[in-house]
């Protein structure tokens, strides 16, 4: 599983990094995105949907860290 660590980064950087990871991934790959910017809770799911990918898991971890698990279901250009 590829991990995108956006802890300590604020909008729009987590979205930029998540998008780049999705663009560089192959169909079928799983990406874990970690962020602690509260805006990411809404921004990342919107990005995933916009790019046609699948958000398979979301959870709030300790210390305000948000964890998103995304499955790449189609190529992103």
From Swiss-Prot:
Source domain of life: Archaea
Bilayer-crossing regions: none
CDD domains documented for this protein: SirA_YedF_YeeD
Active site: 11 (cysteine persulfide intermediate)
Coiled coil: none
Protein family membership: Belongs to the sulfur carrier protein TusA family.
Protein name: Putative sulfur carrier protein AF_0188
